Each structure stands twice: as structure tokens, then as C-alpha cells.
């Protein structure tokens, strides 16, 4: 399955040392990657053409790239609503 456009947001601790969950929406379907399954978000991204979110360039993307140790968004178009 390929996802054209996916809206996403992450929830972290205040000092960003832990990712609680990542929530994505494609059409009217929600996908939730809780703390113990956050790593599965990378596989989800491999099927995604564009990610959309608010302040994802300034916050979400850097946090996730740091957590995974590389640019997990390298193959996605990025649209930030901020």
C-alpha cells in the first residue's frame, strides 16, 4: 500500500528524551505508533510520498531523525503548516 499524503504529529516528554507516540492520518484512517512500536513508523514512511504537519520542520522531524540516527524523511516531500 502506498500513501500519497499523510498528516502526522508526535508526542514527547518535555525534554524530548522519549517519544510517547506518533499519530498519522491518511484519508479518514488513523495510524498510531505507541512508545513500544515507534520503530514501525519508519516502515510506514517508506510507503509515504508526502508528510504534512504543523511545525514538523522545526520540531517533529529533527526529534525523529535524532531518535533514529538518520534522516528517515529523505524520500518524502515535506509540507509544514507553520
Predicted regions and their residues:
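Long, highly charged low-complexity segments
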Residues: 1-13
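Conserved DEDDh/DEDDy metal-dependent 3′-5′ exonuclease domain
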Residues: 3-5, 17-19, 23-82
Amino acid at each position: 500500500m502506498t500513501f500519497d499524503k499523510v498528516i502526522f504529529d508526535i508526542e514527547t516528554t518535555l525534554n524530548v528524551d522519549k517519544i510517547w507516540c506518533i499519530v498519522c492520518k491518511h484519508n479518514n484512517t488513523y495510524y498510531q505508533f505507541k512508545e513500544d512500536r515507534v520503530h514501525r513508523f519508519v516502515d510506514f514512511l517508506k510507503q509515504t510520498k508526502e508528510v504534512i504537519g504543523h511545525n514538523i520542520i522545526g520540531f517533529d522531524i529533527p526529534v525523529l531523525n535524532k531518535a533514529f540516527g538518520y534522516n528517515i524523511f529523505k524520500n518524502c516531500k515535506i509540507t509544514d503548516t507553520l
